[in-house]
């Protein structure tokens, strides 16, 4: 939520359900994939079900590992520690930016090729 953390949008303007942005006629399969079989135009779900496709779009997403940084969970969302990767914290980022009058602000991002170059 870079644009929320940067004060461009209010958080409420950026929230939508996933179902509301699914293209009409598409099927949303809410299951984990265990294996791909491109030679058969198929994939196998974790429960063993095999799905065949003509066109496949895979959106694996990302899993954030907040516990990987010692002490982060203890202070995230207060003490000047925030993240634009967390929907409820992006407004706090903007609050911190607005109130910064001196000192240093540290911004980090994961290595490319992408999560979100600006977040």
Indicate residue ranges for each PLM-predicted region.
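Generic detector of intrinsically disordered, low-complexity, polar/charged segments
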Residues: 2-4, 45, 58, 68, ...
């Amino acid at each position: 939520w870079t644009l929320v953390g940067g004060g461009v949008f209010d958080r409420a303007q950026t929230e939508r359900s996933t179902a509301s942005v699914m293209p009409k006629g598409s099927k949303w399969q809410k299951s984990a994939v265990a294996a791909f079989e491109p030679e058969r135009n198929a994939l196998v779900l974790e429960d063993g079900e095999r799905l065949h496709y003509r066109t496949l779009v895979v959106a694996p997403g990302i899993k954030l590992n907040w516990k990987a940084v010692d002490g982060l969970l203890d202070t995230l969302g207060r003490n000047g520690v925030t993240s634009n990767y967390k929907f409820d914290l992006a407004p706090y980022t903007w609050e911190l930016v607005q109130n910064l009058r001196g000192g240093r602000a540290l911004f980090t991002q994961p290595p490319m090729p992408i999560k979100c170059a600006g977040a």
